[in-house]
């Protein structure tokens, strides 16, 4: 393709000029290398040789150009890579420099309190590398991006200005930027120094001992910190806003980068495809050049020559002779005339065919109408019509009879089915009633059983509790009786000890009166000091043992009480949980019973509404059964309440056992106190015996004084003992009252035991009642079973009725059979009539055969006419063809007789060149050459038209309206 185009282009500037003139023109402009063509016999050979040499030179020039293009392409790629690395490094430097300036500005805003530095670094300029514009379709997008970015930053295109400016201007601009950064850094240093000075002043004021200075420093520091806080808050808000805007811009830029990367990948793929296409075209061009050279060599070697006034092999193509061109034009005109003649003939034939078809249809319609009229007028048709009408009337009558029989049969069947359905409905409703009643009774029975089981379990629990409490109660009775006896004995002993004390006091008074001498005092002085501390020790030990014993007994009692209290609390908690569970179960059962009763009542109401007129007796029975069941339910609920009360009574028993434990502890305490009193009485008796012995001794007089002192001490002790005795007596009274309370409590417990026994008896009676109810329910169940049997008997009776109805149905079916027999006889008569009709049809067939014979003869005549007309048409056709041949031969004769008025070959070539140029120009704009192909439909246009169509979203082929996309058009290179 490119080779052919280049050859034409080389030969375009006037082919009529001879080669000598061409060389002269070339010499006038440029120096051309001389080429030896060898021996040439004619101008045609000279043209061929010159063209061959031109082709070779052009091929060499193309190879050189291709090599230069490859070198330049590699050089361009290297430069692009270098530029990309330089741009990347410049962008990195600019980014970090701008970041540095931004950080300096933020630091100044952060620390400079005196002046607002919002506009400090307005001179800061961002290094932005202008991206290359690879395609025309992306230019508009970049313009839009620039328009958007113009309002965002004041100095946006620093690198662009650097690229457009000279080296001196670049140095000045960079110097300005460095100066601005240096000034910002120096300002940071000054700000930091100011802050340092301020901090030092505040620290001096704070460190100074003066309170006023400290207050001033604190106030200044507070104000400073408040200002700093507000400034920092503003700064954080500003930075947050900036961060938001930057994040949004970053997301936008990231999306743009992704789209650009996808576009770059698409463009790279397109470049690869185009490169591959170029390589392919070049290979093809080289192959064609080689092939053309071989063809030319063969032509030269074999000695082919092309003669004619303007014939020449130009650019690898052989031009056409003018005479041949005229001949071809003449032939084309003749062919046009022939085509017109043929078209006229075809039109005539089509019109004739339409006329014949219309006549044929008319004749068919006339034939049909004529045959029907003829058949209707025949006497056989009229006879058949009368017979058909008679038979049709008879068949209608038979149909009416048959329909009546069918309606009767359907009616009887319908009534029978309705009766059966009614019986089945009654049976189903009765079954449902039975089921509901049985289910209700079973539910009530199950509830009664559950309640009975619950009561039995509770009764067993109460029995077990009573069995456990029985031996405890017996032991308590024995203990109480033994304690009563023991208390009586203790009272007697106390009275006896009181008497002994009175006697001892009287004896002591007597001894006081007797002892008066000093001898007894001296004798007693040696022995009494030894005895007194021993006695005192004994008394103190007795008191300690008494207090320890009382404390131990109290602790034991408290421990027992605490254990019992814990056990009772656990029991109470368990019993409460059981009660709650039982109450929940009972509530659930009650709800179920209510739901079931509601459902049963609804079902009964529905059943009653359906069968009000039929089952009055059944209603009364059901109402009585329901009343009985309700009464039994009420009784069961009352018995349940009584059982609950009994359970509560049994649960209250452990609390009374607590009082028993307290009484036991009080009794133990009183026993211990009585034992202590006995021991003290024994000690006093021993002392009296010792004193009597001492008084009998000779040294009694000496010890009188000591005895008097001892008497005083003993008097004090006696007063103490009296007080203790009074306390013991009060305690004895308290124990007596407690004992009386215990007796009363025991009486109450006995009453409760009796009540429990009565409750147990009631439970047993209720159990007997429940057994009786169970028996009654069984009897009711048996009655219901009897009712079921009666219903079954009713169903059997209804089945008998159904059988009778079926017998009636059989009778009706026999009647239908007789009717069908009559119908068969009628059908036989109809068949006889059909036979007659068949005979008439045979007659009609004979007539048809005669008619067909006549039609055959007519067809034969028609065929002969058609054959004659066809032969005539053939003769006419041959005559026309002969006339056309004569006219064509006459034209040839005229052309041979005419002189040679053939135009020059250069004019023909120029017209061909114009035609080819018109073909190579774009049909959309009629300006540019075709250099883009649509791969969907393979129509060729210029790349600018296709691109504008793609950008303006008119993505359809201008010729065939085939849709195309971004990857569906490619560049092509034609010469």
Curated annotation (Swiss-Prot):
Q: Where in the cell is it found?
A: Nucleus
Provide GO CC annotations from the record: HULC complex; nucleolus; nucleus; ubiquitin ligase complex
Q: Which GO terms describe its molecular function?
A: histone binding; p53 binding; transcription coactivator activity; ubiquitin protein ligase activity; ubiquitin protein ligase binding; zinc ion binding
Kindly indicate whether the keyword Aminoacyl-tRNA synthetase belongs to this entry. no
Quote the EC number. Answer: 2.3.2.27
Family assignment from sequence similarity? Belongs to the BRE1 family.
Q: How does it assemble?
A: Component of the RNF20/40 complex (also known as BRE1 complex) probably composed of 2 copies of RNF20/BRE1A and 2 copies of RNF40/BRE1B. Interacts with UBE2E1/UBCH6. Interacts with p53/TP53 and WAC. Interacts with PAF1; the interaction mediates the association of the PAF1 and RNF20/40 complexes which is a prerequsite for recruitment of UBE2A/B. Interacts with PA2G4. Interacts with FBXL19.
Under what name is this protein listed?
A: E3 ubiquitin-protein ligase BRE1A
Biological source species: Bos taurus
The gene designation is: RNF20
């Amino acid at each position: 393709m490119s080779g052919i185009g280049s050859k034409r282009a080389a030969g375009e500037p006037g082919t009529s000029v001879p080669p000598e003139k061409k060389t002269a023109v070339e010499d006038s402009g440029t120096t051309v290398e001389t080429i030896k063509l060898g021996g040439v016999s004619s101008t045609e050979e000279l043209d061929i040789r010159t063209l061959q040499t031109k082709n070779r030179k052009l091929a060499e020039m193309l190879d050189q150009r291709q090599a230069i293009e490859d070198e330049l392409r590699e050089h361009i790629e290297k430069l692009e890579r270098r530029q990309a690395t330089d741009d990347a490094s410049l962008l990195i430097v600019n980014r970090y420099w701008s970041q540095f300036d931004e950080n300096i500005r933020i630091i100044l805003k952060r620390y400079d309190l005196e002046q607002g530095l919002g506009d400090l670094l307005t001179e800061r300029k961002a290094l932005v590398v202008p991206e290359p514009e690879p395609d025309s379709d992306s230019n508009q997008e970049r313009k839009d991006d620039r328009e958007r970015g113009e309002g965002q930053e004041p100095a946006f295109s620093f690198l662009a200005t650097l690229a457009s400016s000279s080296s001196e201007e670049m140095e000045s601009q960079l110097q300005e930027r460095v100066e601005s950064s240096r000034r910002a850094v120096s300002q940071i240093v000054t700000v930091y120094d100011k802050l340092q000075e301020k901090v030092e002043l505040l620290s001096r004021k704070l460190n100074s001992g003066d309170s006023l200075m400290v207050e001033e420093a604190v106030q200044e520091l507070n104000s400073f910190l408040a200002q700093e806080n507000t400034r920092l808050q503003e700064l954080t808000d500003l930075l947050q806003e900036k961060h938001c805007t930057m994040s949004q811009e970053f997301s936008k830029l990231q999306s743009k980068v992704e789209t650009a990367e996808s576009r770059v990948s698409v463009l790279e793929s397109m470049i690869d495809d185009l490169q591959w296409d170029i390589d392919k075209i070049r290979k093809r061009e080289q192959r064609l050049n080689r092939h053309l050279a071989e063809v030319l060599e063969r032509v030269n070697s074999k000695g082919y020559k092309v003669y004619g006034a303007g014939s020449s092999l130009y650019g690898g193509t052989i031009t056409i002779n003018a005479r041949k061109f005229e001949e071809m034009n003449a032939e084309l005109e003749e062919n046009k005339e022939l085509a017109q003649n043929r078209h006229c003939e075809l039109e005539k034939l089509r019109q004739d065919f339409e006329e014949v078809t219309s006549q044929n249809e008319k004749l068919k319609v006339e034939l049909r109408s004529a045959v029907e009229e003829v058949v209707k007028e025949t006497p056989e048709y009229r006879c058949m019509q009368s017979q058909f009408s008679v038979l049709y009337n008879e068949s209608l009558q038979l149909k009416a009879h048959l329909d009546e029989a069918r309606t009767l049969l359907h009616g009887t069947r319908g009534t029978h089915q309705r009766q059966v359905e009614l019986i089945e409905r009654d049976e189903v409703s009765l079954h449902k009633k039975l089921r509901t009643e049985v289910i209700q009774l079973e539910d009530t029975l199950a509830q009664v059983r559950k309640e009975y089981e619950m009561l039995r379990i509770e009764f067993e629990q109460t029995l077990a509790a009573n069995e456990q409490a029985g031996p405890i109660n017996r032991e308590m009775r024995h203990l109480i009786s033994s304690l009563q006896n023991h208390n009586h004995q203790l009272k007697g002993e106390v009275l006896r000890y009181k008497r002994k004390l009175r006697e001892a006091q009287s004896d002591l008074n007597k001894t006081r009166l007797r002892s008066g001498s000093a001898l007894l005092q001296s004798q007693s002085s040696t022995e009494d000091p030894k005895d007194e501390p021993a006695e005192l020790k004994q008394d103190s030990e007795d008191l300690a043992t008494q207090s320890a014993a009382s404390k131990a007994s109290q602790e034991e009692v408290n421990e027992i009480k605490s254990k019992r209290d814990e056990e009772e609390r656990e029991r109470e908690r368990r019993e409460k949980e059981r009660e709650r569970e039982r109450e929940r179960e009972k509530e659930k059962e009650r709800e179920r019973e209510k739901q079931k009763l509601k459902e049963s009542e609804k079902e009964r109401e529905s059943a009653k509404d359906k069968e009000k007129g039929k089952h009055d007796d059944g209603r009364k029975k059901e109402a009585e059964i329901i009343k009985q069941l309700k009464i039994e339910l009420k009784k069961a609920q009352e018995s349940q309440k009584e059982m609950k009360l009994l359970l509560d009574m049994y649960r209250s028993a452990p609390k009374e056992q607590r009082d028993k434990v307290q009484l036991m502890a009080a009794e133990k305490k009183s026993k211990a106190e009585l034992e202590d009193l006995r021991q003290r009485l024994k000690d006093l008796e021993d002392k009296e015996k010792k004193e009597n012995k001492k008084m009998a001794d000779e040294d009694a007089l000496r010890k009188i004084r000591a005895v008097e002192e001892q008497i005083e001490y003993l008097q004090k002790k006696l007063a103490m003992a009296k007080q203790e005795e009074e306390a013991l007596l009060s305690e004895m009274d308290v124990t007596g009252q407690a004992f009386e309370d215990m007796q009363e409590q025991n009486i109450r417990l006995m009453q409760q035991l009796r009540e429990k026994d009565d409750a147990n008896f009631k439970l047993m009676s209720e159990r007997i009642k429940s057994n009786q109810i169970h028996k009654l329910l069984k009897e009711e169940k048996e009655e219901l079973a009897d009712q079921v049997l009666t219903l079954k008997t009713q169903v059997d009776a209804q089945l008998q009725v159904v059988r009778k109805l079926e017998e009636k149905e059989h009778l009706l079916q026999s009647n239908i059979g007789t009717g069908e027999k009559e119908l068969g006889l009628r059908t036989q008569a109809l068949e006889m009539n059909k036979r007659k009709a068949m005979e008439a049809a045979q007659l009609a067939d004979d007539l048809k055969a005669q008619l067909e014979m006549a039609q055959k003869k007519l067809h034969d005549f028609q065929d002969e006419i058609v054959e004659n007309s066809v032969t005539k048409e053939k003769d006419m056709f041959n005559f026309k063809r002969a006339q056309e041949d004569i006219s064509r031969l006459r034209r040839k004769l005229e052309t041979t007789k005419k002189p040679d008025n053939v135009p020059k070959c250069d004019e023909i070539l120029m017209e061909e060149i114009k035609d080819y140029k018109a073909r190579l120009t774009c049909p959309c704009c009629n300006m540019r050459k075709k250099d883009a192909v649509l791969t969907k439909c393979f129509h060729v246009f210029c790349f600018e038209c296709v691109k504008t169509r793609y950008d303006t979203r008119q993505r359809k082929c201008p010729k065939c309206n085939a849709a195309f996309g971004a990857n569906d058009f490619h560049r092509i290179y034609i010469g």
